[in-house]
A protein has these predicted regions:
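Structural/interface elements that position substrates and couple domains in central-metabolism enzymes
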Residues: 1-114
Length: 114
């Protein structure tokens, strides 16, 4: 069930390891998921949160990964292949029955991938 789920999206930029959010397709993903009444958290260490808000009306966190582990997510989406995501402790952020949708193949958790 996707309704009312907490979803973490890793990455918002147009391409990996750069701050450019112009022409990003991640916004399309966010808009599609919002139709299901989900709670979306976007984390991208390269994005200026004010720019994400200004251009797309999205809240984007640029907090260090360890600050995200207080909340458990039903789904984690690897949307951009930033080097900064390699060391993330995905298991500590994911519910026990949660899933990982790894669009870019950057998250190494084969047992929970869709």
């Amino acid at each position: 069930q996707i309704n009312d789920s907490n979803i973490l999206i890793l990455g918002l930029t147009f391409k990996e390891n750069c701050p450019d959010i112009r022409n990003t397709k991640v916004v399309d993903l966010v808009k599609a998921l919002e139709q299901y009444n989900v709670n979306i958290t976007i984390y991208d260490p390269y994005v200026d949160p004010q720019e994400a808000k200004k251009f797309f009306g999205l809240n984007c966190l640029n907090l260090p990964p360890n600050n995200l582990s207080d909340e458990l997510f039903s789904c984690i989406v690897g949307a951009v292949k930033h080097d900064a995501f390699r060391g993330l402790d995905i298991d500590s952020m994911l519910k026990s029955n949660g899933v990982i949708y790894d669009i870019k193949g950057s998250l190494v958790h084969y047992d929970k991938r869709l």
